[in-house]
């Protein structure tokens, strides 16, 4: 019985199932899972394994190969199936996504006893039956067939026939050959010779091709650009991921679009690279329309999708923005003309300035007080009267003395009296009063405010400078007449 795909679960419900492979791989499983590449794509994976008598001594290596390869596919929506073949084929694990059943299927696979012939077509037939029951073209399936010997008789033709049926159902077929296999036989069974993985070193070397199988089989779409477009606009879609070269060799890559979940169309991509793809997209004519994007690598038989949706939105055509910019530029030009018009195109004739006011009269300085000069008692010189008895004083100045004093001769006992000048005491300067106000506290915006104030003062000064040149009421203004006079001169 084939299990159907389980319904969607909450993110937390996958916590334990997502770790089942790490538990099976032992204590170092978590570290290896972080270091080794993995595949997050959701698809159905079928292992078709040779259990003929020639692999009896190497079955544990085949089991380890299956276990380690299954660890790399980490999508919670992935489903697995184990099929073994010899003279007949047997389903060890029907297709299921239940992690408990997968763990039990691995245990059953480990206990298989190899015996019989190598009828690989019988295993492919059971895989095709499960693909049809699981949904056929609605699912993305991968078949990995492993054998160790040459196919005899009609087995190669039967195997090729079953492989074609698998591809018609949308499945990709990969072959692993160990030791004594024939390369040409497996190339005809697989999709291409690049999808055949030879292991010449024996079963112990199987683990060396796990990364190669993963790189070839895991095709993922990780990013879509753009996610929104303008209504009525032509555009192209860029898909980013890995494994895009899978179907590009035979031209079977298609970009599939579903518009509003109503109709579907497919186109060939413009270019396909290993990790990117460029596809032309249909035009969306209404706002709110959605475009669901998916990719097919087998000519449309099966598709790969992952919530890749493009939405149409209303967009302005840019004319309104251009008009607004032009209007702003026009207003700016008018403002500049108004500012510089008085400087370049107007000559202002002003009335002559009034005569300057008379200079103020300088006040006469007060004469300095007369200096006290020494006086001489001329009585000792015999002047003023008979016998010089009458007292007479002679005052000396900067120009000499009086006429009487000029005719006198100094007596021996003449006395010169010099008035004593009293020195005024020096008054000490009163101390400077202490400032009564505190300096303003500096704010964080003080430097910015200072620079803005300086810029505003500069603009005001320039404006005042221009405004002084503007004509005032009563001024005579000449524009073209003055220009003509200058030209004629």
Swiss-Prot record:
Q: Give yes or no: UniProt keyword Transmembrane.
A: yes
Q: In which tissues is it expressed?
A: Expressed in prostate, thymus, ovary, testis, pancreas, colon, heart, kidney, lung, liver, peripheral blood leukocytes, placenta, skeletal muscle, small intestine and spleen.
Ranges for domain VWFA come to 44-213
Which cysteines are cross-linked by disulfides? 39-218
Give the record's glycosylation annotations as residue positions: 250, 260
Which positions does the record annotate as the modified residue Phosphothreonine?
A: 147
Q: Which residues bind a divalent metal cation?
A: 52, 54, 118
What GO CC annotations are associated with the protein? cell surface; endoplasmic reticulum membrane; endosome membrane; external side of plasma membrane; extracellular region; plasma membrane
Give the UniProt record's GO annotations in the biological process aspect: collagen fibril organization; single fertilization; uterus development
Q: Does the keyword Protein biosynthesis apply?
A: no
Q: Which InterPro entries match?
A: Anthrax_toxin_rcpt, Anthrax_toxin_rcpt_C, Anthrax_toxin_rcpt_extracel, VWF_A, vWFA_dom_sf
Q: Superkingdom, according to UniProt?
A: Eukaryota
Pfam families for this protein: Ant_C, Anth_Ig, VWA
Mutation: residue 45 to P; reported impact is: In HFS; infantile form
Q: Which UniProt keywords apply?
A: Cell membrane, Disease variant, Disulfide bond, Endoplasmic reticulum, Glycoprotein, Membrane, Metal-binding, Phosphoprotein, Receptor, Secreted, Signal, Transmembrane, Transmembrane helix
Where does the secretion signal sit in this chain? 1-33
Which segments sit on the Cytoplasmic face?
342-489
Task: Enumerate the GO terms in the molecular function aspect.
Answer: metal ion binding; transmembrane signaling receptor activity
Quote the SMART domains the UniProt record gives.
VWA (SM00327)
Its assembly, as annotated, is: Binds laminin, and possibly also collagen type IV.
Give the similarity note: Belongs to the ATR family.
Record's disease association? Hyaline fibromatosis syndrome: An autosomal recessive syndrome characterized by abnormal growth of hyalinized fibrous tissue usually affecting subcutaneous regions on the scalp, ears, neck, face, hands, and feet. The lesions appear as pearly papules or fleshy nodules. Additional features include gingival hypertrophy, progressive joint contractures resulting in severe limitation of mobility, osteopenia, and osteoporosis. Disease severity is variable. Some individuals manifest symptoms in infancy and have additional visceral or systemic involvement.
What's the protein here called? Anthrax toxin receptor 2
Say which species the protein is native to: Homo sapiens
């Amino acid at each position: 019985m084939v299990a159907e795909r389980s319904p969607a679960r909450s993110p937390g419900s996958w916590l334990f199932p997502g770790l089942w492979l790490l538990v099976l791989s032992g204590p170092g499983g978590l570290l290896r899972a972080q270091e080794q590449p993995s595949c997050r794509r959701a698809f159905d994976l079928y292992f078709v394994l040779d259990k003929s008598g020639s692999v009896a001594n190497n079955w544990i290596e085949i089991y380890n190969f299956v276990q380690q390869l299954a660890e790399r596919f980490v999508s919670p929506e992935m489903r697995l199936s184990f099929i073994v073949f010899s003279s007949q084929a047997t389903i060890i694990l029907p297709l299921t996504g239940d992690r408990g059943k997968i763990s039990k299927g691995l245990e059953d696979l480990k206990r298989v006893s190899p015996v019989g012939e190598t009828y690989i077509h019988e295993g492919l037939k059971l895989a095709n039956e499960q693909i049809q029951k699981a949904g056929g073209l609605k699912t993305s399936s991968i078949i990995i067939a492993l054998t160790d010997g040459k196919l005899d008789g009609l087995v190669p033709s039967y195997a090729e026939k079953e492989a074609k049926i698998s591809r018609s159902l949308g499945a990709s077929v990969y072959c692993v050959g160990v030791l004594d296999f024939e390369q040409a036989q497996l190339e005809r069974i697989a999709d291409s010779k690049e999808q055949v993985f030879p292991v010449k070193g024996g079963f112990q070397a199987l683990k060396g091709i796990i990364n190669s199988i993963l790189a070839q089989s895991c095709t993922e779409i990780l990013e879509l650009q753009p996610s929104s477009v303008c209504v009525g606009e032509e555009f192209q879609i860029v898909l980013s991921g890995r494994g895009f070269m899978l179907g590009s060799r035979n031209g079977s890559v298609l970009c599939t679009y579903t518009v509003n979940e109503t109709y579907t169309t497919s186109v060939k991509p413009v270019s396909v690279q290993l990790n990117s793809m460029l596809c032309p997209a249909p035009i969306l004519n209404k706002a709110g329309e959605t475009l669901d994007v998916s990719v097919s690598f087998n000519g449309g038989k099966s598709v790969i999708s992952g919530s890749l949706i493009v939405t149409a939105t209303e967009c302005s055509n840019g004319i309104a923005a251009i008009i607004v910019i032009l209007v702003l530029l026009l207003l700016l030009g008018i403002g500049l003309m108004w500012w510089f018009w008085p400087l370049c195109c107007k000559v202002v004739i002003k009335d002559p300035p009034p005569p300057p006011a008379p200079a103020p009269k300088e006040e006469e300085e007060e004469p300095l007080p007369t200096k006290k000069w020494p006086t001489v008692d001329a009585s000792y010189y015999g002047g003023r009267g008979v016998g010089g008895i009458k007292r007479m004083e002679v005052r000396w100045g900067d120009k000499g003395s009086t006429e009487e004093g000029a005719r006198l001769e100094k007596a021996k006992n003449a006395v010169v009296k010099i008035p004593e000048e009293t020195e005024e005491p020096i008054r000490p300067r009163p101390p400077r009063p202490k400032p009564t106000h505190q300096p303003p506290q500096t704010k964080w915006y003080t430097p910015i405010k200072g620079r803005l104030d300086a810029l505003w003062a500069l603009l005001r000064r320039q404006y005042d400078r221009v405004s002084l040149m503007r004509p005032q009421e009563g001024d005579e203004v000449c524009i073209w007449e003055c220009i003509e006079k200058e030209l004629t001169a």
